[in-house]
């Protein structure tokens, strides 16, 4: 059990990146609140927001954070994974992170575009972010358990 607990501490270094998508997300979701809540989640060591995470500058933020914070997994709260999942996986891989330790929380289509109430949309975005964080933790623990 002690060995498992040591592995858990080593692997749980997650970064959360929340995109404004201009006003597509930020007009309905309180992006700062999502960042604030995500930062409090177990295993999260870095959380930040940016206007366009899919942009070159946004990808550079992800790459730099992976290096500087020694991240083992990332969650990107943004638009549909169909749109930019490959973009974020490539950025993670460029930084030396396993691209399959990237999870997308679709807060544009699932929150911003379908809710008018900011509080409701923000709460749902936080829930989706937490679910994505939990999935990354599970993937990290599973990959480490296989190595034991």
Residue spans for each PLM region:
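Residues forming the flavin
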Residues: 1-148
């Amino acid at each position: 059990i002690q060995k498992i607990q040591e592995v858990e501490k080593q692997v749980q270094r997650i970064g959360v990146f929340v995109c404004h998508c201009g006003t597509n997300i930020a007009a309905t979701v309180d992006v700062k609140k999502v960042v604030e809540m995500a930062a409090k989640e177990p295993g999260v060591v870095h959380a930040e927001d940016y206007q366009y995470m899919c942009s070159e500058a946004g990808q550079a933020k992800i790459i730099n954070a992976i290096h500087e914070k020694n991240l083992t997994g990332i969650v990107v709260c943004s638009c549909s994974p169909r749109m930019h999942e490959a973009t974020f996986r490539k950025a993670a891989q460029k930084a030396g992170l396993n691209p399959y330790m990237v999870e997308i929380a679709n807060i544009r289509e699932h929150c911003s575009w379908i809710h008018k109430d900011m509080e409701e949309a923000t709460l749902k975005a936080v829930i989706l972010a937490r679910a994505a964080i939990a999935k990354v933790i599970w993937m990290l623990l599973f990959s480490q358990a296989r190595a034991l």
